[in-house]
């Protein structure tokens, strides 16, 4: 399997052969401060730098906010590396959107003036009025960017995003099955956080759910997708499943979720909860000569920063899986080693 639909069918990927734009929405939630909830950073202090560093890597092929690249505590590299290779090979334009960052990136970006998300284990995530304002601003961004392309590809980077995604799914009355950046998904810890968080949800109205248990990146992605006048590829895993369920309750969007096979084969995740078709791509990292890349096949990291979506687009544009892996390894050698 290099590319296959795991739910439904869609022509959106075909559109990516024409004019496409990649939009990376980045932000932070203080939920990432809960010990053991995420490994999206080499240590707790560095977690807040992961989203801006991911965005910098996509533009420059190196990070400016931190030394090296975002990695797990034992050195497994950010999925931004895969997205970087795909963007380089396809020449698709990149736009970065700040939706609630703690640390702004050292690159040009669009700012939605979104709040940082609060720790959903302790309080409501965001002020409802703020969420509504950010959503409207994001719709404007989506509308304008969609004029440049036949399809908008939207990715995300937010540590602890799978935890807020689980809370959103639960608050919407769905099974809170989400993936993790670790092979041993801290399911029990997430479940406790989610149970505590959903007690604050007053209704299953999507804006209320977002405000109570979501995160600012969800607001940005949902708004951009809702504002787009063209079809959308939601480039991500279970976080995009949660966002897709919010979007489907807020308006009409022609969308498909594109993720990696590592999420699709994760027993703790449930992509069938998506209201839109889902396609999974295999970046072939299991065949890599580098342990840091093979780790993806072993259940580490899995997805993020639009990696699965951009791999799918690269394949749709005729880049062979063998060539793609070769180029990812070249970038890994230059950027990581």
Swiss-Prot record:
InterPro entries: Nict_dMeBzImd_PRibTrfase, Nict_dMeBzImd_PRibTrfase_arc, Nict_dMeBzImd_PRibTrfase_sf
Coiled coil (UniProt feature): none
GO molecular function, one term: nicotinate-nucleotide-dimethylbenzimidazole phosphoribosyltransferase activity
CDD domains, A to Z: DMB-PRT_CobT
Family affiliation: Belongs to the UPF0284 family.
Name of the featured protein: UPF0284 protein AF_0276
Naturally occurring in which organism (per UniProt): Archaeoglobus fulgidus (strain ATCC 49558 / DSM 4304 / JCM 9628 / NBRC 100126 / VC-16)
